[in-house]
Each structure stands twice: as C-alpha cells, then as structure tokens.
Amino acid sequence: MSPKTLYDKIWDAHVAQEAEDGTCLLYIDRHLVHEVTSPQAFEGLRMAGRKVHAPEKTIAVPDHNVPTTAGRENPDQMPEDSRIQVAALDTNAREFGVHYYPVTDIRQGIVHIVGPEQGWTLPGMTVVCGDSHTATHGAFGALAHGIGTSEVEHVLATQTLIQKKSKNMKVEITGKLSPGVTAKDIVLTIIGETGTGGGTGYVIEYCGEAIRDLSMEGRMTICNMAIEGGARAGLIAPDETTFEYVKGRPHAPKGAQWEAAVNWWKTLYSDDDAHWDKIVTIRGEDIAPTVTWGTSPEDALPITATVPAPEDFTGGKVEAARRALDYMGLTPGMKLSDIEIDTVFIGSCTNGRIEDLRAAADVVKGKKIKDGMRAMVVPGSGLVRAQAEEEGLAEIFKDAGFEWRLAGCSMCLAMNPDQLSEGERCASTSNRNFEGRQGFKGRTHLVSPAMAAAAAVTGKLTDVREL
C-alpha cells in the first residue's frame, strides 16, 4: 500500500462513488447548521417533500445574527432581521427533528465552539457547515470545510457532498515558541508568509513540535484560519491531547466504543513517505506577537515592526497596499506599537474559548482599560461563559471596564448589533480584517487575546511581553 497523508486517509475512507474525472461523492459524518445559510436549504426540502436524511448527525445552533446583550431570549427584544432568522431556524430544527441548541439553552454558542464542546467533532470525521470557518474542526484530525447554501440542502437531503480532491500541503512549525507567543501569532505569521492565496487548491496539515505543544484550543485557532490562508481545510493529526479533550464529552463514544475509537484514531497520521505537493517550514522561535496592519490577513507583521510602504511591494500588491493604508489611516514608517485603538473585541470562533479568556484576563487583572476605550468580551458559548464566571474571569473583566456579553459571533462580522462605527479602530481576536468586516468603514487589527487585552489597557497596539 502506498504511503498516505492524513488527508488521503480520511478522504479515501469517505468516498462513496468516484467518476472518471475524479469527482467524488463524499459521505458526511457531521452537518452543522446556523440561522444565516440554512433557511433556503430547509425550504428547499419542504418544497420537494423531502426529510433530513440523517437528523441524528445534524446540529443546529443560532450564532451569527443573535444579539449578545441581556433580554435576547425575548424575540421582541431582537432586531427584526435577527428575530426572523432565529425564528426560522427554530421552526426548521423542530420540524425536521435535528439536534438543536436555542438561544435559551446554556449550550448555545458559536457553532464551531459548540460542536467540539459537545463531542460532536471527532477524529477521522468529515464535517461540513454553511460557514467558511468550519475548518476549525480540523484541529481534531477531521476533514472539515465550509459549503454553500445549495450544498447545505444537498447534505440535508442525502448526507453526501459532491467534491473533487484537493492537493496536499504541509506547514511545519519547528522548535519551541518564545514566551508571549500564541497560536494566533503562529497562524498570522503563516498567512503573512504564504499569503491569502498560498493554500489555494490545497488541504493543509499543520505539524511540528510547536503545533504538537499546543492545547486543543490553540489547535482550533490554527485550523480556524486555514481558510484565510486560501486552503480548503486545515488538519492536525490527533494525539493524546486530542483524546483527552474529547473523552467524556456528551456525544463522544463511551465504554468499549471509546477504546475502539481511540485505537482507530491512533492510525490517523501522515505516513513518513507520504507525498506532499507543497511544504512550508517556519521556525517557532522566529515567531513574535503579531498584528495585522492592512485589510487582508496576509498584512501581518511582528508588533515590533513598522507600517510598510507601498514601494515595499511588487506587482498588484503595490496598489493594494496603497489602498489598505488609505483605508486604515496609517502612514508608512510609523511603529505598529504607536497605533492608537479605541475598541477591543475578544471573542469569535477563532479566540472565544476558555483558554483565550484566561489569557486575556491574566493581562488585565488588577488594571483598568484606557479612558474612552470600548472593550467587550463575548464568550464563544454559554458553557464557556459559565466556566469563566465560575473561575472569576468575568469579574476581572468587569472590574477592568470590559462589557461582559452573552455568547454569539458578535463583532466578528457586521451582521448583528455589535458593530464598529465609521473610522473606529479595533484590536480584534477574530479572523478577518477586510474593509467593512466589523462595520462600515471600521478598521480592524487582528491580534491574539493577550494582545487585545494589552491594547485595551494601554489604548494602543502593544507588545504584551512588555506588560
């Protein structure tokens, strides 16, 4: 048998049928749905008189457009568009009999946090959702990626997806990370080096000592942003860290099934002589706390750097840099650590887990946010929120001047009430810094939770190592 990558193994195990041109019918193990990309799909089933093929493998949760302020359990307190979408998901989930976590359920939260938290995401699975950051689940050694609304309907109806296989790409982070450097810094550094198109046409497997040393929360941060690097999906091979995280979760295997599952999961790794179409290697010790300066995730530099000039680039990137600098209101040559911030957002499917909140709380404990600063912490799920309150993190944030919100996608995207105003500049733990992503003419700098917390305290982008 020829050597295989982890991606090869999962793909081959799920191919139900293959055409002569390489197009495959892929079986899907888990289908996650939310309120924004599913209404038309459910309506399509209804119009065709179809049922959900595997409701026991379909998980629904409202997250993108739900308010994160108190009173949201009352539909009359929601903005009209939020109310309509949440009500539609509620109706569809109950009518079609899928697993459902409504806003009144403490288990509700961002779908890519709820899935792993509840044990729905397991190694070796195929996972899809009508959301690009489905790649998050690849941290478990699952093949996970986003799909469009028409594909959502197809998976609901058949539990399969028509796909062509991507190429294999390996990103290895060697050695150890320096103190103060996090998973978010790793993935921003990777994208800064490879560009947002570096992974186009590939599934990326992240490996190396620095990746192995990460917790599951950190690994989810890495895979979450595989899509920002252009990849179809991101993968990290499962190991004892993975098994320990999954064990005992509500929908994880139990008893003899657990032992059998772990024995199989231990075979999910890339063989030594497997073929890679592209390899990128970065030394962990070379990675520093990282921030974005422009309007693309690839506009990432160490916090110790200065804002680049358009002349530092070539080709079409010259004009792109000029436009980004104009939009962001920055001057070439200024220190990144001199950029003043007026808003801080800690949350999202990238960095809304308990470990992220602990890291931010460690920075702000005993301190106050800068006068005039608007800062909010939005836990990724109701269970994360409850745990943070039990650990005293919520009080640390509130004492420092942060808003302590309910679970949801919040300010990651300008789809719900949590938005930037024109010209506001935000240090954000989310995943995209596009023009208008957080609000009309809002300016976004992507950072780790610790770096976001540091910015809240100092009022500017700050090297957290100095605090």
UniProtKB/Swiss-Prot annotation:
Matches recorded under Gene3D superfamilies: Aconitase, domain 3 (3.30.499.10)
Names of required cofactors: [4Fe-4S] cluster
Residues annotated to bind [4Fe-4S] cluster: C349, C409, C412
Uppermost EC category: lyase
Any one GO molecular-function label of the UniProt entry: 4 iron, 4 sulfur cluster binding
Pathway assignment: Amino-acid biosynthesis; L-leucine biosynthesis; L-leucine from 3-methyl-2-oxobutanoate: step 2/4
Pfam families assigned: Aconitase
Keyword list, A-Z: 4Fe-4S, Amino-acid biosynthesis, Branched-chain amino acid biosynthesis, Iron, Iron-sulfur, Leucine biosynthesis, Lyase, Metal-binding
GO biological process: L-leucine biosynthetic process
Cofactor: how and how many bound: Binds 1 [4Fe-4S] cluster per subunit.
Reactions this protein catalyses: (2R,3S)-3-isopropylmalate = (2S)-2-isopropylmalate
InterPro entries: 3-IsopropMal_deHydase_lsu, Acnase/IPM_dHydase_lsu_aba_1/3, Acoase/IPM_deHydtase_lsu_aba, Aconitase_4Fe-4S_BS, Aconitase_4Fe-4S_dom, IPM_dehydratase_rel_enz, IPMI_cat
Keyword Acyltransferase recorded: no
PROSITE patterns linked to this entry: ACONITASE_1, ACONITASE_2
E.C. no: 4.2.1.33
KW ATP-binding (keyword) present: no
Subunit structure: Heterodimer of LeuC and LeuD.
Protein family according to the UniProt entry: Belongs to the aconitase/IPM isomerase family. LeuC type 1 subfamily.
Function: Catalyzes the isomerization between 2-isopropylmalate and 3-isopropylmalate, via the formation of 2-isopropylmaleate.
PANTHER family (alphabetical): 3-ISOPROPYLMALATE DEHYDRATASE, HOMOACONITASE, MITOCHONDRIAL-RELATED
Name of the protein described by the UniProt record: 3-isopropylmalate dehydratase large subunit
Organism expressing this protein natively: Ruegeria sp. (strain TM1040)
Lineage of producing organism: Bacteria, Pseudomonadati, Pseudomonadota, Alphaproteobacteria, Rhodobacterales
